[in-house]
């Protein structure tokens, strides 16, 4: 699932079909070159659901994860913009440093594309983006 937010919090329904290719493992790959995403003013974010039900939103360069036998380091994801996507909620092993908290578990996650290019920096932005995500999910 790709969720795109405008700067005012509304949902952007941009067609990203040109970016989606079939991966070697049969999963859909969102291949968005880092330079292209920066030029178009977009940044990719990961939203992971903690076991207690709360969410964390963070730039992909702060996370590493494994999906269907493929491993993505944070810096790798930020540079290549390659993410394995499945229909609906996807469960992958996500290794996230959340402040002093080291999280490693199977979390569902979605890739969030923010057209403003503004980084998620600090608790306020994280809460705002999680609220946008929850609002979007409620519309489904």
Label every PLM stretch briefly:
Residues 1-121:
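N-terminal assembly/attachment segments of tailed bacteriophage virion structural proteins
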Residues 114-134:
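Low-complexity, Pro/Ser/Thr- and charge-rich linker/hinge segments at domain boundaries
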Residues 136-140:
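Heptad-repeat coiled-coil alpha-helices
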């Amino acid at each position: 699932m790709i969720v795109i937010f405008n700067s005012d919090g509304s949902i952007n329904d941009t067609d990203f079909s040109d970016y989606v290719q079939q991966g070697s493992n049969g999963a859909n790959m969102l291949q968005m070159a880092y330079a292209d995403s920066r030029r178009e003013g977009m940044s990719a974010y990961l939203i992971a659901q903690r076991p207690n039900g709360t969410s964390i939103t963070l730039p992909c360069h702060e996370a590493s994860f494994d999906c269907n036998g493929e491993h993505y380091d944070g810096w790798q994801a930020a540079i290549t913009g390659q993410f394995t996507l499945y229909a609906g909620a996807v469960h992958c092993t996500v290794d996230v440093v959340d402040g002093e908290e080291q999280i490693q578990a199977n979390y569902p996650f979605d890739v969030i594309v923010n057209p403003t290019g503004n980084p998620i920096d600090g608790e306020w932005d994280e809460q705002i983006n999680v609220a946008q995500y929850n609002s979007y999910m409620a519309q489904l």
